[in-house]
Amino acid sequence: MRYITSLDPSSLNSSFLPDLLTQARRRIPTLQRSSPAFFLVPLLVSTTLGHAHQWVPHIYAFATSELPSPPPHSTTAPLREAAPLPKDETNPHRLVVRYMKEALAKSSCIIGAPRAIEALLELDKVVPVEAKDDSFVREELDQSRSNQERAEIGMKGISTVYQKDIVGIFNMMDPYLKDIRWFAQNITYGTYLAPHADKTPETSPDPFDQDSTLLSILTLSTIVPQRTPREILWHLRGAIRRGIPREQVRSLHEEIEVVCRACGVDNVREGISTVDDVDKQAEEQ
């Protein structure tokens, strides 16, 4: 894999990034018409590879470019008691921000908090006040969730990706990797990736629960750039299990490689498993 020096920020003022994002909108597979996948993939790949400070403003501008103008912010309007659930959000600009915020919050357990925080702060700089999102997705974790509940929710979330295979993976970890096993269940899934796996999409404050494919889009967009062979194979398989058709998983994997190349990282899939290495799954019957 060849690493290239960082992109010249001035190049982002030309047609390079808008063209890339336009192509991503066309090529990234989605099962839902209003899916945010077209901006989440470049957001997550660029943040994983350290380009958030250059890319985030352009990604936000592109993601909202075809939306109607947000309603004007009123300094006299009463504060909202609580952010509406994602399904009830009436401001499409704020919903875009919510998806971007939650994608970066989830990604921090995969790519590291510093890069996620950098991207979140860059996002906050460019979001106008009328599109600011004050949702607190994990508020319940502070209020009423016991450790046992968190473990159960984590197992429910992790099982949507690994199904019965998680038993063998956890058995492999148990002798010498008990901390990693605990983190995977309680923190990675129970707190970051699937904090409301026990809720229905209608009652969950997590926007990712509105579309079962988004979690796989997030995990692949953050682990493929890191070239972690086992995790990539597991999550290619998990994407099929979470409802993405095999050929769309292939297209997603290829598009992640395109964005990696634009970030200066070539051949990210070289020598790494592809969807062709995934056995036929029950969901494909």
List the model feature ranges, each with a label.
Residues 203-285:
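Alpha-helical oligomerization segments
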